Every structure is written in C-alpha cells, then in structure tokens.
C-alpha cells in the first residue's frame, strides 16, 4: 500500500528513486464508517481516522500490524533548498584522500533551487516488536528498537530506507535523501531530510521472505550472479604487474588450491593517473593476453575502478569538455544519462574489451567527509558532515542515491555491450533497487579484530533484511 501526503494542492505523481513504475492494482475496496474510512486489500485493512488522518494497519482478521500516532502523525516542514553555483567567488582546494586527490569546495555561491519538505512520520511500535534493516551500520546492533539510526552514506555505512518488522510487515521510504530512524524516550518516528512530499510503502507479509518479495515487487528482482562469483576470490593490496597476477594463478593451480577469481586492486593505471580507465602499459603490456591466460585456467579477473578521475587523465578531460562532472569536482555525474554512457564508453574501450570479467567499484558514495576527521566523529556529527559536504555537489533529495546510479552505469553498459557475461559489481555503496544491477556490497575499510567480526555479523544480517541479497 502506497501512502503519500503533501500540504500542496496536488501530488507530484513522481515514482521514487529505485522504485519501478507502478502497476494498477485491482481487488481493493473502500468502506466509509462514522469516524473512519477503511481500505481493504486481500491481506490488509487500513483504518484512516477522518479527523486526524492517522492510520492503523491491520491484517484482514483484525490483528494489528502497526499504528501511527493518534494526533499529528505526519509532519511536513517546508524549507528552501539551494544549489551550488560555480563562479569567480568559488574557493576550491585539492585534498589528498584514500581515494586519490579530490577537489573540495570550501566556499561557493548558492542560489535557490526549489521548495522541499523535512518529513516526519510518527509511529507506535508494539512492546515486543523487533525491527531490522535500514542498510548497514557499523555499531553491531541487530534489533534497532530503542536506538537512533542515521541513514547517510559513508565508508562504513550503507543507507537503505527499508525497515522490516518481526510483526510481519515492512516500510519502504520513497526518498533519495538522507533520513533518520528514532525510537527513544523522545519519540518514535521516521524522518527524511528533503522531499517534495511524504511518500512511503507499507508491505504486509506473513514471513520475512514475503516482505522481501514485496520489496522486490516494487524495486526489482535480484540479478543472478555467475556461478564463479559464489566461489573463492583472491585479493591482496596489491598485485602490481601482469606477470605477478599470472604467477599467482599458476601457483594456486599447481598446489591444487581452489581459485575462481583474482582481483587487481587500485593502480592499474599509469602513475599519477588516478581513476584513468586503462592499463599502465609498462606493467600490463598485454592485458588481453593476461585475461586469456587466466580464463584458460578457469580463473576470472576483477578490476577496481573509481567514479573520480585525476585532472591529469584523458578520461577527466573528456568529461570536463562535455560538462558531465559534478560541480567543481573530478567525479562524474552518474545522475546524467549522457555521463553514464560516457563513463561506460571509457570502461569499454580501456578495460572491458581486454577481457575483464567483474568490477570493484570503489568510493561509490562518493563523498566520505569522515576521512578528513582526525578523531572519529559521533553518528550525529557524521550525518551532519555528509549532509553539508555532499549537499555542495548533489541535490538534497538525491543525496543518498549516487551509488545506485553508478551501479546502473556498469550494469546497463555491460549488458548492452555483451550478454555473454553476467554483471558482477563489488561496490562499497548502493541503494533501494540496487539488487537488480548485479551488486555485491562490502562493508568498507573495517579493522581486523574479533570485535569487528562480531559487529559485522549484525551488520550483514540487517543489510540482507534491507532487500539486497549480496
């Protein structure tokens, strides 16, 4: 059931980021009673209070799934959103980061863009109810009850605004903005930072499988990975030459160890050419012959690539000339179809044609202001930093969704180029609907400790409860 709410005279009619085009559904009825209107579907009854608009979500047999707060269950706070203008007053610094040198906007003019809402949906969860999902957090919390969760992208965080309940339902926020889940003494609500209207889906299901099935009905089926992707994938930081990669593959085979893929982590490019989508000819003189030799041993080849490109690269110059970069940055604008096609063209010409089988899409958030902190910030500080920094480059209502569009670039580009290989995209970030683009998420640059391993179990379970299987 889709629920939308606005203070304007009409709804936008837009479909949320990551959600497929809606179908017309038959089989629902409406009954008006003295104090409420009741909507019925095959599995669900929604009781809407005529005076307050508050909704109770029930099974057809009367069992309560969820109730909204009786009064003022939906709050919209209108605000002016602004976008960055690059002009003679813009101050930009180049900063060395773990993901290469990046241009950072320190000062810039801002102009009015549009009116948006901060939205807040107040809910009354049942005492014994457990809540899961919302992507991946690093704190190791499984049941999210009694906590505050800040949904923004980061190196160690994957924000997916989909919540599942032990009481048999899920809630999918139709938003591309950052968001907050709160369940404390100060209230229980779902907050979004910037939307044109409040928009969400209530998904009823008798089991977790049924809830996830409902999520994928809305956002797409998970793409099937090739069989080798479920096997052993060998990586280290890092293999430096074509000869070294072939030697490692031969050693695995000579010793009888299982090996399904080898990964070339960063610096496949020439020195000083961060993000250039081509091989360094001095270290990889014949990449096609290298992948042919690997394939003869039934070993596949994965390569890491970035959305940002050094200013010294030909790839950057091509994007700059066509004005397909995010404002004052070296990061391509994955929201623009022309930019996605150009990015894949560069991948195709410099990498894919040489037999690369899979991609390691690093830094796909693509902003990680926490790297600049000398001391680890708290969750609320990290949220504020991301909203501030990413907001200089990406519209507020799309701020969390860059990784989804980056994955779309790879999936659509490769499938158009060839249907002989299934898409495998090991990436650090994605969003609602990412499962249909062949993504495998990893949890960022974590520390090697037993405590970290313990927390990763909860992080992985909540991530899978968010609708993405890998």
Show the residue positions of the predicted features.
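N-terminal small/glycine-rich loop or linker at the start of catalytic domains
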Residues: 218-235, 322-331
């Amino acid at each position: 059931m889709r629920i939308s709410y606005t203070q304007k005279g009409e709804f936008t009619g837009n479909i949320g980021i990551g959600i497929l085009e809606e179908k017309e559904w038959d089989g629902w009825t409406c009954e008006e009673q003295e104090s409420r209107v009741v909507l019925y579907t095959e599995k669900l009854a929604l009781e809407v209070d005529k005076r307050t608009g508050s909704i109770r979500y029930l099974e057809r047999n009367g069992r309560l799934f969820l109730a909204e707060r009786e009064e003022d269950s939906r709050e919209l706070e209108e605000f002016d959103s602004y976008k960055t203008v690059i002009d003679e007053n813009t101050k930009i610094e180049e900063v060395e980061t773990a993901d290469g040198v990046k241009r950072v906007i320190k000062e810039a003019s801002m102009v009015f863009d549009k009116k948006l809402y901060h939205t807040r949906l107040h809910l009354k969860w049942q005492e014994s109810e457990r809540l899961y999902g919302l992507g991946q957090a690093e704190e190791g919390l499984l049941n999210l009850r009694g906590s505050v969760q800040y949904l923004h992208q980061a190196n160690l965080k994957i924000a997916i605004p989909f919540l599942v309940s032990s009481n048999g339902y899920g809630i999918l926020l139709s938003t591309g903005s950052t968001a907050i889940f709160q369940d404390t003494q100060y209230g229980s609500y779902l907050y979004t930072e910037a939307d044109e209207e409040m928009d969400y889906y209530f998904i009823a299901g008798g089991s977790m499988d049924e809830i996830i099935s409902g999520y994928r009905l809305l956002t797409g089926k998970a793409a099937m990975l090739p069989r080798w992707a479920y096997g052993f994938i060998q990586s280290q930081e890092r293999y430096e030459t074509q000869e070294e990669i072939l030697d490692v593959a031969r050693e695995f085979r000579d010793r009888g160890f299982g090996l399904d893929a080898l990964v070339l982590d960063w610096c496949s490019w020439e020195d000083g050419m961060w993000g250039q989508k081509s091989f360094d000819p001095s270290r990889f003189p014949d990449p096609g012959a290298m992948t042919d030799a690997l394939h003869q041993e039934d070993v596949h080849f994965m390569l890491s690539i970035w959305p940002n490109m050094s200013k010294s690269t030909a790839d950057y110059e091509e994007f700059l000339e066509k004005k397909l970069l995010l404002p004052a940055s070296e990061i391509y604008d994955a929201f623009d179809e022309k930019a996605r096609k150009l990015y894949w063209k560069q991948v195709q010409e410099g990498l894919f044609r040489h037999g690369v089988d899979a991609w390691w899409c690093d830094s796909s958030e693509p902003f990680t202001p926490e790297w600049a902190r000398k001391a680890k910030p708290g969750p609320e500080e990290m949220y504020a930093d991301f909203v501030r920094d990413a907001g200089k480059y990406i519209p507020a209502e799309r701020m969390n969704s860059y990784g989804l569009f980056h994955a779309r670039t790879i999936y659509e580009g490769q499938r158009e180029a060839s249907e002989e290989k299934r898409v495998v995209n090991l990436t650090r970030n994605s969003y609602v609907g990412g499962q249909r683009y062949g993504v495998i998420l990893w949890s960022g640059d974590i520390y090697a400790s037993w405590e970290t391993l313990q927390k990763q179990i909860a992080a992985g379970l909540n991530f899978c409860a968010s609708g993405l299987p890998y």
